[in-house]
Amino acid sequence: MEFIMKTRMFEEEGWIRKKCKVCGKPFWTLDPDRETCGDPPCDEYQFIGKPGIPRKYTLDEMREKFLRFFEKHEIYPHGRVKRYPVLPRWRDDVLLVGASIMDFQPWVISGEADPPANPLVISQPSIRFTDIDNVGITGRHFTIFEMMAHHAFNYPGKPIYWMDETVELAFEFFTKELKMKPEDITFKENPWAGGGNAGPAFEVLYRGLEVATLVFMQYKKAPENAPQDQVVVIKGEKYIPMETKVVDTGYGLERLVWMSQGTPTAYDAVLGYVVEPLKKMAGIEKIDEKILMENSRLAGMFDIEDLGDLRYLREQVAKRVGITVEELEKAIRPYELIYAIADHTKALTFMLADGVVPSNVKAGYLARLLIRKSIRHLRELGLEVPLSEIVALHIKELHKTFPEFKEMEDIILEMIELEEKKYAETLRRGSDLVRREIAKLKKKGIKEIPVEKLVTFYESHGLTPEIVKEIAEKEGVKVNIPDNFYSMVAKEAERTKEEKGEELVDFELLKDLPDTRRLYYEDPFMKEFDAKVLRVIKDWVILDATAFYPEGGGQPYDTGVLIVNGREVKVTNVQKVGKVIIHKVEDPGAFKEGMIVHGKIDWKRRIQHMRHHTGTHVLMGALVRVLGRHVWQAGSQLTTDWARLDISHYKRISEEELKEIEMLANRIVMEDRKVTWEWLPRTTAEQKYGFRLYQGGVVPGREIRVVKIEDWDVQACGGTHLPSTGLVGPIKILRTERIQDGVERIIFACGEAAIREWQKERDLLKKASNVLRVPPEKLPETAERFFNEWKEARKEVDKLKKELARLLVYELESKMQKIGSIEFIGEVVEGSMEDLRELVEKLKKPKRVVVLISRDGYFAVSVGSEVGVEANELAKKITLIAGGGGGGRRDIAQGKVKDISKAKDVIESIKSMFS
């Protein structure tokens, strides 16, 4: 679809619409002689060495200039909004915030929640991995950048501003505030689509650099049954009009600072506090500035994902500056590595400060990718500097603007240090892994490691393709690393899977029903109630009101009975479909629409769920205070006997930490703090309590239920809770588990369940005391004494076993039979698999075959290097005769037979092979 993008300013101020002679796209300009749109590769950078803004700005100065301009605008004052975390806790469809508009998707865009201000202005740190392979090379690409933006949400009947005003505001900011030359600014028409939305858009270009994008979001993805007269096609996808029309702008903070300084790259302009120290550490010689400038000018027109080959760029730059490609590579490569390290470590600082824990999954995977890529770059530079030292430079520089960096500094640096140690261990183990894979490829006659194998090495074992290449080339095997390797694996990691639950009842059969009145919220202590039957569908009964809690948020459903005409019918499951609650019953035939039934909750089950749910919130507060603010809930589940809480944490929780957590949680219980809950508009709740609200994951709806423990914990939660912490009863941590990389599981019990666990422990202590005939307080020293005595006895047993083995070897040697040039030993003996394996190892000689079978059916075989068969072939023959299974290497094999009565037949059969 082609949009007509004529604005008031273009018409009134003499702007001309032209078609770019290079790319053919339409653009608007004040310059009648202009023939190109201003966008690379149609135009080169024209500001390097000649800044396009009269005065130099720092990041802080440019950010404040932008925010203040929109905040204080006379006609359109905007509400200033603080940055959102780069880890978007309010949504589950993306891993990281990649643009300012993502702060307001889906709730504000859909109209389910009000924006924090309308219109608003924000400077949002954004992280994108799509360009990771361009970072350091093009001079303009970053994984971390700040998207300065002004947004307006035009709800039906409540317009704010649209295309005319947006273009005028942008032009006013650039020309009046930053003093850019109007005739050098172009507005290029380029429809935008992303995140399920689309609309017409302008790219604002100035002297070869895109400095802003102005999107007019007015379409959403079309459903399959959308009316055809409403459907428009944008970039090959079908869309329909949105009710809310959104002004979605993005101004590149780093690019504007770069424009004001005219440095060879944007990295020099905004990351100098890391770039310069790294240059000194690496001892990099200063190169001719002309090389850097020409490299940047051409690199600005280059995209690895498009051209795919860095060599092409090198050739063009080398030709322009009059040196060889090799000379250029030698001069420019260290700079590119340093720029990439500076960018990646800044992205890491934001990610870790906002709660990302490095791991093998989701955002943690992307953090680990940055860490390992940065370490690899440092290694290529020959630098031994710890990565944590570089991250510390970012914290030192940025903490005044982002005070949370200083608060999290110790944890951020410890996470990085631990990751560096893990990577060193990965490399140590990984070398053998790569060599084994190379051996397999060589056997098949393959002389190059395929790309999919490089991806497996990276994703499953943490081995970067550069490391694999280094090892492979020593073994004579080729490795071609795709130029876009890292953006390729990051793209795969960023895909989020949509989980669809089982459909219990067809929603179409429920959509005409009113929302179920939730009595469990009105009175969480309601044990009995009366309600009217609205519908019966298969085994499910729908009531107009219920005190039965439906499964959700980690809390199991309630059970109990519905009493019909004096008869109790069991309720075995309760679920929520939309805003309707459905009850599974044992005898659905007993229910008729319109009848009144009496419900009774299994109170013993419910109250224990309430104890465990409130206890989960108490424990979460203790975990954050003891372990740090990086701790976030990664899942939870309640039962009547125990509860579990999964948290993000970068190492195992120590015993001392567990004691402190448990003590702190129980102190809050004993203080009997108030637990309150209220329904708040989503935006109000976020502004009041921050994004730590979303501990339990994304909570849908315009209004969210906020559960608050007095001065301790606040979460958006739909569960049933106790009115004070004292009712939780004692909290006992039973154990912790490492369920996956970066996630700790705490299993605990509250109230009666905790008391039962203490009673179990007391019974075990009593039993152990009775066995050892000592009082419980003497158990540790008695157990230690017994253990030491057992160790001494074990040493004696081992000595005797070694002596017996020596005698057995001597005896077996004496039974050796000569068959031609081969020595053969075959016997049935006593011993474990381990014993047999040790014996055949000791008896092994170049021209000898040894077959030993134990009376328990274990067997071991050894074959000398000068014997013409392999041990694993003999193992197959043994199991063919006596059943069972086994296998091994060329020289040693082992296994177990099913039929021990055939042991002698086996030995004779093997012996006959050499007769």
From Swiss-Prot:
It is an enzyme of class 6 (ligase). SUPFAM superfamilies: Class II aaRS and biotin synthetases (SSF55681), Putative anticodon-binding domain of alanyl-tRNA synthetase (AlaRS) (SSF101353), ThrRS/AlaRS common domain (SSF55186), Translation proteins (SSF50447). Its EC number is 6.1.1.7. One of its GO terms (molecular function) is aminoacyl-tRNA deacylase activity. Its cofactor is Zn(2+). It catalyses: tRNA(Ala) + L-alanine + ATP = L-alanyl-tRNA(Ala) + AMP + diphosphate. PROSITE patterns: AA_TRNA_LIGASE_II_ALA. One of its GO terms (cellular component) is cytoplasm. GO terms for biological process: alanyl-tRNA aminoacylation. The keyword Membrane does not apply. Zn(2+) binds at residues 613, 617, 717. Belongs to the class-II aminoacyl-tRNA synthetase family. This is Alanine--tRNA ligase.
